[in-house]
Each structure stands twice: as structure tokens, then as C-alpha cells.
Amino acid sequence: MNKVVLLCRPGFEKECAAEITDKAGKREIFGFARVKENAGYVIYECYQPEDGEKLISELPFSSLIFARQWFVVGELLQHLPPEDRITPVVGMLQGVVEKGGELRVEVADTNESKELMKFCRKFTVPLRAALRDAGVLTNYETPKRPVVHVFFIAPGCCYTGYSFAHNNSPFYMGIPRLKFPSDAPSRSTLKLEEALHVFIPEDEWDERLANGMYAVDLGACPGGWTYQLVKRNMWVYSVDNGPMAQSLMDTGQVTWLREDGFRYRPNRNNISWMVCDMVEKPAKVTALMAQWLVNGWCRETIFNLKLPMKKRYEEVSHNLAYLQAQLDEHGVNAQIQARQLYHDREEVTVHVRRLWAAVGGRRDER
């Protein structure tokens, strides 16, 4: 199988294609990307027959910025007979996947696919039963086995394949299903909540998002991101010239500092988190983030970079390379991840975690 499907935000297919071509090429997995504007997915076709599986095995999914999900597939299945769509799908997967741990019947995230999504939901149950009977799926779901993907691009027309559970998105279609909290000051709160789900393993939340931590929110008004920190019982310094939502101030956990986020300097040395969603040029935001990390003003940060209209992958890559160079120059050991989240628009979200010298018993090496 030599094709890899990458799901992405509609309108960002070129960025997704540029990224996978670049990163696959650096691993000497050569091929070309098939791109259809606003399709919500890209197909990277490798020149060598087995390179599709090699790519999704060797390239860390967490290193991709513009892909929400990926999986290796075979040839396109077309003209599935309405009276029996299951048999051809099972036939394509037999001998390709043995004892997969989960089935996902998916579509691209476009308006055109909404009707198709209804069909996928109905189709999943009988298909799962047939795949279990054929030995393609285990009799129960398990995260230790490959995920089987059936990806419909039109009625009666789909790709079939698989991804590895340790190197994919754990979410259906790569999208965490989050509900907007009615008491949150703005919808931007969902960006930070999604970032926490994407960047921090669930079993580390109690340690890395602990009660009583100190956090800073730069450019906080009206408090969408501060809300997520308060919800996790942190003490938050919210920095913005604009006012904060009264509901947040009433918690007693928020200190509003009426200052410019670019000029603010923290006056305590035990800040665990700094978050930032300021509308500013990416280079200016990246330079500020580098300053915080190099000076050790926070342990972890999540921030957004607003994207230009053109050369968006190049712009993000340039800023992340600058950040890495600054950290390297000052001897700071850190882990950097970036992703265009479902709740992001013309932007990407970046997570950086400073790693200190190893201390016995601490998983984060602080």
C-alpha cells in the first residue's frame, strides 16, 4: 500500500501537502501529493509500494502541524453496489489488516460530507460485525492493535486502510468532540481546551494541570483561555488592557493586570503555565515566547501563531526553527509541538514544555 490519506482543515490542503512532502522527503520516503482545493484531505502517493506503511510507522504523527489524522490506504473502491456495500469493503481489508482494534468510518470535514456522515454512522455497525467475522477486527476494541479506517469521499466511493494506535490521532476524524461551556466568556476557550487534549496525555493531567498551580494568560480579555485555567483550580494572572469577565473575577482565582502582554514581566518564579492568544505577527509572538522560555519564567506554554495569507507552512516552519535555535543557543532542553486545531482558523497552536535535569520519580524530567 503506497498511499497515505491525511485529513486537514478545508482550505489548508496545500499546506498539508507541502508539509508531508517535506517531512517524508527528509526520511527518504519520496512521492507526490494529490491535492483538491477545499476537499479537507490530501493523498500522498509514495513511489515505492511499501512506503505508505513505512511513513506512518516512522514519522511521528505528533510532528505534523496541518494533518488532523492519517492512515495508509490501497486503491479507491468505486461503484459500491447499494444492495451490498459491505462485501467489497471486507474483501479489500482481508489480508491487509489482521485483528484490528477499532473501526472508524469517516469522511472529510466539509459541508458536502454532512449527508455522507449520516450514512457512515448507519454503516459502521453492520460493517464492524462483518469485519469481526472475517478476522479483520478483534471481537472487542483494543488500543493495542491497528485502527481500521474506511474513508468515504462520495456515496459508494471509499478508501480502506489502517493507522497505528500509537502514532495517530485518538479522535474520530482527528477532531476532539468538545462542548462549549455556557458560562465561558468566549468561544476561544475551546481552542485551549482542545490544545490540552491534543498535547498532554490524559494520564498526566493530574500532575501537569494540577490544583493550585500558578499561570499567566497574556492578552487575556475577556477570559476564554483564563476560564480553562480557573476550571482546573489554578491561580491566574490575566494580563490585558481590556477588562476580564466579571464571572471569572468573582472566583477569587484571577488577578487582572492592566498591562501590555508584550511588556509584562512576571514577579514570581513558580509559574507552571503561560498561555497566549494575541493577534500579532507570528515573529513577534515567537520572540516573546522564546524570551519566557529562555528565562525560565514558565515551565510549559501554549500559544497561537496567526498565519499570513500565503506561504503559511513556510512561515510556521521558520518561526518554530527560530524558537528551537533560541532554546538551543541558551542550553534549554524543551519539547516543541504545533498543530492546526479543529477550533483554530487562520492560525496554529504551539505547545512547548521545558525539561529540567532528571530528578528521580518525576516523569517530566524536571
Curated annotation (Swiss-Prot):
Superkingdom of source: Bacteria
Top enzyme class: transferase
Stored InterPro entries: RlmM_FDX, RlmM_THUMP-like, RNA_MeTrfase_FtsJ_dom, rRNA_MeTrfase_M, SAM-dependent_MTases_sf
Reactions it catalyzes: cytidine(2498) in 23S rRNA + S-adenosyl-L-methionine = 2'-O-methylcytidine(2498) in 23S rRNA + S-adenosyl-L-homocysteine + H(+)
Molecular-function GO term, any one: S-adenosylmethionine-dependent methyltransferase activity
Pfam families: FtsJ (PF01728), RlmM_FDX (PF18125), RLMM_N (PF21239)
Cellular localization per UniProt: Cytoplasm
Catalytic machinery residues: K306 (proton acceptor)
One GO process term, biological-process aspect: methylation
Keywords: Cytoplasm, Methyltransferase, rRNA processing, S-adenosyl-L-methionine, Transferase
GO-annotated cellular components: cytoplasm
Record-listed S-adenosyl-L-methionine binding positions: S188, C221, P222, G223, G224, D240, D260, D277
EC number: 2.1.1.186
Description of how the protein assembles with itself and partners: Monomer.
HAMAP family: 23SrRNA_methyltr_M
Family assignment from sequence similarity: Belongs to the class I-like SAM-binding methyltransferase superfamily. RNA methyltransferase RlmE family. RlmM subfamily.
Protein's job: Catalyzes the 2'-O-methylation at nucleotide C2498 in 23S rRNA.
Database matches in NCBIfam families: PRK11760.1
Name the UniProt record assigns to this protein: Ribosomal RNA large subunit methyltransferase M
Organism the protein comes from: Salmonella heidelberg (strain SL476)
Gene (name only): rlmM
